[in-house]
Every structure is written in structure tokens, then in C-alpha cells.
Regions:
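Acyl-CoA/ACP chain-elongation machinery
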Residues: 185-193
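Conserved "HGTGT" condensation-loop signature of ketosynthase/thiolase-family condensing enzymes
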Residues: 1-157, 177-180
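Active-site histidine-anchored catalytic micro-motif
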Residues: 171
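Short conserved active-site loop signatures built around small residues
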Residues: 168
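Short, flexible active-site-adjacent loop segments at beta-strand->alpha-helix junctions, enriched
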Residues: 107-109, 165, 193
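Short loop-beta-helix segment that forms the pyridoxal 5′-phosphate
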Residues: 157-163
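Internal active-site segments that recognize and position negatively charged phosphoryl groups
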Residues: 174
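Residue-level "edge-of-site" marker
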Residues: 41, 162, 192
Length: 193
């Protein structure tokens, strides 16, 4: 069996150090830390009160209001990074065979923010089991890969890797192998949390 050559043609990222590859890489070279005080919730009862959060995140810069409400922040981050990678690669303009382009994305937990919101609302409510109809679609670990595929019309291999902190690495390896063994011509891969 002849193995296909695999190359990286585009990259994207949305991190505490930068919201794109150039700003991330620049901060990395300068030794900047992405850690800071937790701002997403009241952490005063916890011993650790710092985390690596994406600062100044505004979903409306990337999604319309309706779409943003249907996506957990983890999926928003992954989709934005994937858009950057697809744009840099020129894949969308290359008119690929959409049946031969896939998406494999990793997430250790998935929509934890959504889970926390829904459970908190339930616990503080009147006891009636009312949940947002988008609760499950927002929090499942494969919604990021699915959304990226739907956005571009990719119909190749599509799934999520869930293997704790190794999720994104496993997703990248699976995407590499999909190309290497001829199951796809191009793959969008990475991870989000």
C-alpha cells in the first residue's frame, strides 16, 4: 500500500495568548503568560483563583446572535480557529471534492459552560425539569466538528476525539491517518475546550 504524503496548509488558533496564529506565536516567543484572575465566575471559594481564559471574547464578532446562542463557547472557539485554518489553506477556493474533506476535532469535556448554566438554572428553579432545547446540542463533544462540516459542506470523515488532555492530539493523528491512508484528501483538525 502506498502511503499519501501529508502536509499542513493552514493553521488557526484562539488562545489566552492570542486570537490568531501570529499574535499567539509572538506572545509565545516573548514568554507571555496566558494565566490571570478568573473572570467567568466567582472563584472566591476556591483555593485557585487564576486560569487561562480567552480574554475579551465577543461571539458577535464571529457569529450572528441566533447562531451564537446555539453554540457553547468551546465550539465557538473551535469554529473560529477552523475558519482561520481554512482561510489560510485556501481550501474553500480550491473547489475540493466535498466527500473527500473531513473534520476531526477533540475536546476533553465539550460544553461544560452550557452544562453548568443549565444545571445551575435547574437547581435554582422551582424544581420543574425545564431545560433549554439546545442543552444537548450545545454541550455534546462532537458539535464543533459537526458545525464546521456543515458550515463548509464537508462530507468526509467527521467525528470528535474525547481522550482528556490528549483529545486534540488524537484528533490530529486521526486526521493525518485519514489522509495518509487515502480515506480523505483534506482534513480540518484540532481541539477546543
Amino acid at each position: 500500500m502506498e502511503l499519501n504524503r501529508v502536509v499542513i496548509t493552514g493553521m488557526g488558533c484562539l488562545t489566552p495568548l492570542g486570537k490568531d496564529v501570529p499574535s499567539f506565536f509572538d506572545a509565545l516567543k516573548r514568554g507571555v503568560s496566558g494565566a490571570g484572575p478568573i473572570t467567568r465566575f466567582d472563584a472566591s471559594k476556591f483555593k485557585t483563583q487564576f486560569a487561562c481564559e480567552i480574554k475579551d471574547w465577543d461571539p458577535s464578532e464571529h457569529f450572528d446572535r441566533k447562531e451564537a446562542r446555539k453554540l457553547d463557547p468551546y465550539a465557538q472557539y473551535g469554529i473560529v480557529a477552523a475558519r482561520q485554518a481554512v482561510a489560510q489553506s485556501g481550501l474553500a477556493e480550491a473547489n475540493p471534492d466535498l466527500d473527500r474533506v473531513g473534520v476531526i476535532f477533540g475536546s476533553g469535556i465539550g460544553g461544560l459552560f452550557t452544562f453548568q448554566q443549565e444545571i445551575t438554572a435547574f437547581a435554582q428553579g422551582d424544581g420543574t425539569p425545564r431545560f433549554n432545547p439546545f442543552f444537548i446540542p450545545k454541550m455534546i463533544g462532537d458539535i464543533c466538528a459537526g458545525h464546521i462540516s456543515m458550515e463548509y459542506g464537508f462530507r468526509g470523515p467527521n467525528y470528535a476525539c474525547v481522550s482528556a488532555c490528549a483529545s486534540a492530539t488524537n484528533a490530529i493523528i486521526d486526521a493525518f491517518n485519514a489522509i495518509r491512508y487515502g480515506k480523505a484528501d483534506a482534513m480540518i483538525s484540532g481541539g477546543a475546550e
